[in-house]
A protein has these predicted regions:
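Short, conserved clusters of charged catalytic residues that mark active-site
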Residues: 30, 34, 116, 134
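N-terminal segments that cap or nucleate solenoid repeat domains
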Residues: 38-55, 59
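C-terminal/domain-terminus segments
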Residues: 126-142, 146-148
């Protein structure tokens, strides 16, 4: 379902969003359930077994149907998901063209990914399964499965399976019961 966000839809969304945020005060499970329903209602494709999405994450509301999130995905604080980009307008103006424009692109995050705080995910990005995207990273393009990405622009600094095995052997983490 393609819902373009006119002013009325934005007002409705903001009112519903206030309710979702307040639900976090009652229960984390209730918050996640309501948030998933809200995002799905506006066209985002989101797995039934959603992980965690921090309330401060920003999803480009130009067209939610351009965003797909898999199972067990963690989205940390202040992550930006941008599905459109108007930079081409400045490029066209600089080259003497009198027309504007914008780029649109889908964003897909496959299963079992961790997106760190203040990551920016740009249009036309596909993040494969089991990836870790480090805090502050700017991501664009295809990210291979099991990659650990860091920086601006994002670069692969390791692989999640090797990283997980190393920390499992060192036992330097706190296990979740």
């Amino acid at each position: 379902m393609d819902i373009r966000f006119n002013k009325f839809n934005k007002i409705i969304y903001k009112l519903l969003w206030v309710g979702v945020r307040l639900s976090k005060l009652v229960s984390q499970d209730l918050y996640l359930k309501l948030y998933q329903r809200l995002l799905s209602k506006f066209g985002m494709k989101i797995a039934d077994r959603m992980g965690y999405i921090d309330p401060s994450a920003f999803f480009d509301n130009y067209d939610y149907s351009f965003i797909t999130i898999g199972s067990n995905v963690t989205i940390s604080r202040e992550v930006l998901f941008l599905t459109h980009d108007f930079s081409i307008s400045q490029g066209l103006a600089a080259s003497g063209k009198e027309c504007g424009g914008y780029f649109m692109g889908k964003i897909t995050i496959e299963d079992n990914c961790f997106i760190g705080a203040r990551v920016t995910v740009l249009p036309n990005t596909h993040i494969g399964k089991n990836c870790i995207i480090g805090a502050g990273t700017v991501v664009k393009g295809k990210i291979e499965e099991n990659s650990i990405m860091l920086g601006n622009p994002a670069r692969c600094i390791g692989h999640t399976d090797e990283w997980g095995n190393r920390h499992f052997q060192m036992k330097d983490y706190i296990p979740i019961q």
